[in-house]
């Protein structure tokens, strides 16, 4: 688990934080890149990396976002400054460069550059599941199995030789190693939750006849970079225009800490581009829900790009080993909102993610390191929001099979509106390894709009007509009141005129701790578990530069 410290979002305060060191700063340059210009830590795509600057050299590995598509002249400018174009994207208006530190200030003066940041490290976030969310009924009663829908699995690759996938891995591309075959195990496990379909098999995926697009970005240790993930998203967008692949869903069971508002985060901007292209993007919330490093009890720990308001961000539930839903509880490690900087209400919903059995054959990094997690043969148990995410991606594929003309917003709204909203006030989980107990409260920052119910989503009749971007929270430091606000300029469906009722999205009885009930204006109780200066004040939580693997191998009791 990574540790976080507090720092200001402002450039001025960030400069002061560095003490006597003289640091040039500009609004379109990320604070961590500004700091790297004077520190000389290691490159973001080096095996020992912590950020995007080369130790002992004068170069930095960066991702540059442009306001309009970069031209050949802009690429040539980088070359003339001694830099190298590493990755040129197509649908995403960005580029990955390795440049001398001395060139950054010159590049930042280009009015077409929206934002420059380090090429940051990214890592993966680490049957009963299908029955719990009623996906088995989708096939038996409604004939829905994901047929014709392409799901892009941006992960550690897929072991395509497994019979569980048949011939449904229709495209493979590698963005980090020598080939697209999984060496870590995470991607194959995720793909199995999505679409495993071994004839006569026990472990069947949520959308067992969907086509899988295998885009490998995580190496044998589950590590990657922003640039690799952006390249994979860019490829998925371009493949979506080809009927052969029909990419309608992107699954991102990975992420990293949040460094800036979503409007500047390169991962967030890439997933928004996919969303605008008509692709439903489903992202893991993260597994930092137990983090109390700055006294916030796991709140404010949503990872990037799950902090983006457009995407569907997924938290993890525990099925308690049964197919009934009434005994299911939140996994205490599931990251909680609101998001850093923007204060978006996240996660959007929760799904089963604890002790999930799926495909993961012997001989891969995870199966070698944790042999006790092997169930039998090619099946393995993992827990985390990584495992909950493909459950929702599979659900999205089923909805799109039934409603092929639906937009990503309509899919997101239907899944949220029909999610189960009946929860206990709180629950206690015990870590199976350490024996430490964790208390979870079932507020909107923990469970979002509720617990995924695929049957309810399929049979629902509500169809959203506006944007389904997640709203953000305003905190009045004088009155202590919270209020939900829509994203500026968006025709958002969450307002008081929601077509299925003002309380249907999150429900009317979601409890904040023991004394605060959600509504349009709720009171910030005096015993709130984090101080106002941590999330809401001028000091915001700052994620560490090295992300820990969001993968829970020892699940909760």
Regions found by a protein language model. Name each.
Residues 33-44, 49-50, 247-253, 351, ...:
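C-terminal subdomain of the subtilisin-like protease fold in secreted/lumenal serine endopeptidases
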Residues 72-76, 145-147, 197-200, 217-310, ...:
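Substrate-binding/access-modulating region of protease and related hydrolase catalytic domains
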Residues 30, 34, 61, 75-78, ...:
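Extracytoplasmic/secreted envelope proteins and their assembly/folding machinery
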Residues 26, 54-57, 76, 111, ...:
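Subtilisin-like serine protease catalytic core
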Residues 2-142, 150-151, 163, 471-482, ...:
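Autoinhibitory N-terminal propeptides
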Residues 64, 78, 97, 107, ...:
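Residue-level detector of buried hydrophobic side-chain packing
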Residues 59-67, 92-96, 139-140, 176-181, ...:
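Second-shell loop/turn segments in exported
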């Amino acid at each position: 688990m990574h540790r976080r410290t507090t720092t200001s979002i402002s450039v001025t305060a960030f400069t002061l934080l560095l003490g006597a060191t003289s640091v040039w700063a500009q609004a379109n340059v990320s604070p961590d890149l500004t700091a790297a210009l004077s520190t000389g830590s290691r490159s973001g795509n080096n095996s020992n990396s912590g950020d995007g600057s080369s130790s002992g050299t004068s170069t930095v590995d960066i991702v540059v976002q442009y306001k309009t598509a970069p031209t050949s002249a802009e690429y040539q400018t980088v070359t003339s400054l001694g830099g190298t174009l590493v990755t040129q994207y197509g649908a995403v208006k960005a580029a990955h460069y390795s440049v001398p530190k001395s060139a950054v200030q010159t590049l930042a003066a280009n009015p077409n550059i929206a934002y420059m940041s380090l090429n940051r490290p990214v890592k993966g976030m680490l049957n009963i599941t299908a029955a719990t969310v009623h996906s088995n009924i989708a096939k038996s009663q409604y004939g829905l199995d994901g047929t014709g829908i392409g799901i892009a699995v941006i992960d550690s690759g897929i072991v395509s030789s497994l019979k569980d996938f048949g011939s449904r891995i229709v495209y493979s591309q590698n963005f980090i190693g020598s080939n697209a075959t999984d060496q870590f195990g995470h991607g194959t496990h995720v793909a199995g939750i999505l679409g495993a379909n071994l004839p006569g098999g026990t472990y069947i995926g949520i959308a067992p006849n969907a086509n899988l697009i295998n885009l490998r970005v995580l190496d044998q240790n589950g590590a990657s970079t922003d640039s690799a993930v952006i390249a994979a998203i860019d490829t998925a967008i371009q493949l979506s225009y080809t009927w052969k692949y029909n990419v309608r869903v992107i699954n991102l069971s990975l992420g990293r800490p949040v460094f800036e508002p979503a409007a500047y985060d390169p991962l967030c901007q890439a997933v928004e581009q996919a969303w605008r292209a008509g692709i439903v993007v489903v992202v893991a919330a993260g597994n930092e829900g137990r983090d109390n490093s700055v006294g916030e009890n796991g709140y404010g720990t949503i990872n990037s790009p799950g902090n983006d308001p457009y995407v569907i961000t997924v938290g993890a539930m525990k099925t308690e080993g049964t197919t009934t839903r009434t005994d299911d509880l939140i996994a205490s490690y599931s990251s909680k909102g609101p998001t850093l900087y923007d204060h978006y209400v996240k996660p959007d919903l929760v799904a089963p993610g604890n002790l999930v059995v799926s495909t993961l054959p012997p001989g891969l990094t995870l199966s070698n390191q944790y042999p006790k997690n092997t169930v039998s043969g090619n099946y393995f148990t993992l827990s985390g929001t990584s495992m909950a995410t493909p459950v929702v991606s599979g659900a999205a594929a089923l909805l799109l099979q039934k409603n092929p003309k639906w937009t990503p917003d309509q899919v997101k709204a239907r899944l949220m509106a029909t999610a189960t909203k009946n929860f206990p006030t709180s629950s206690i989980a015990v870590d199976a390894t350490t024996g430490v107990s964790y208390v979870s409260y079932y507020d909107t920052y923990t469970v979002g709009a509720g617990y995924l119910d695929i049957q309810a989503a399929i049979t629902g009749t509500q169809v959203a007509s506006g944007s389904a971007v997640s709203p953000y929270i305003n905190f009045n430091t004088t009155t202590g009141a919270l209020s939900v606000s829509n994203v500026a300029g968006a025709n958002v469906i969450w307002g008081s005129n929601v077509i299925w009722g003002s309380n249907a999205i999150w429900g009317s009885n979601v409890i904040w701790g023991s004394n605060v009930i959600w509504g349009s204006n709720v009171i910030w109780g005096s015993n709130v578990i984090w101080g106002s200066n941590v999330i809401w004040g001028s000091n915001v939580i700052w994620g560490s530069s090295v992300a820990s693997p969001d993968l829970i191998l020892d699940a909760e009791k």
